[in-house]
Amino acid sequence: MTQQDLTTAVKKKGLSRFIHLGKKLGNGVTAVGQGFYVVYRHQLYKQPNNPENTRYVQWFCRRLCDVFNIEVRIEGEPAGHEPALWVSNHISWLDIPALGSGARVFFLAKAEIEQWPIVGKLAKGGGTLFIKRGSGDSLRIRQQIADFLKQNIPVLFFPEATTSDGQEVKRIHGRLLGAAIEAQQPVQIALLCYVNQHGELDQIAPYIGEMSFSEHVMHVLEMPRVTAHLRFLPRIDVTGHTLDSLTHEVQQKMRTGLHELHQQVLHHALDG
């Protein structure tokens, strides 16, 4: 190959990448616009936590998964619609559209997201609850979640309180599980992993390290198709549980369940 041929190939590759990103960004803008249309068309902001609104949240999450080239696949029994406090392992901001595609729930998110342009307003209109990490605000949020559960409003949060590479479940923080005990509603564990086309845990989907959100979005827009595998465990009856005993059971079942999910969907299952 001559130098001229090499230069031409590089230019074509750059142009192809530019066109691909342009289409993805265009699809993303369209999806966000559709999300705002749904919020205002159905006036979701007036009753953002009405359980009926979860169908709109699910629709929007599925649109986002299409934009980000994520196929959502449920392993085992699908999620029920009965009220519960939902918990899941946490890998990326992509967890929200992935989980929201498979389950009709409202999400708990860090308070900073409420201030994000566009995304914050859309999340608030979609019934997201916001919590200030590391502050006394968690007591207020726990009470608010308990009140929602008593009204049969499903809420999902990430008890690890941080993201991981998806290989294992970190130590969970169980304070908010007290909402399930107070409301006497079960705990529903959801587990997920992102698998690439080689049958391995995807390395692009995890939002970890020092990368900024905008940088990670650009990486995600360029990534090949990824499958988000979801697994819903049998619900945990909170009757007779203390906060400590419930936290321990949730921790153990999340770790065991994620390992079993890996064994099921990965070509070369992880050790441990």
Listing of model-derived features with the role each one plays in the protein:
Residues M1-V10, R62-G76, L94-I96, F106, ...:
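Soluble, non-transmembrane catalytic domains of enzymes that act on hydrophobic metabolites at membranes
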Residues Y37-N53, C65-V67, P78-G136:
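Catalytic core of membrane glycerolipid acyltransferases/transacylases, capturing the structured
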Residues T7-I74, K121-G125:
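A transmembrane-helix-recognition feature enriched in membrane-embedded lipid enzymes
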Residues P83-L85, N152-F158, P186:
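Residue-level preference for the first positions of well-ordered beta-strands
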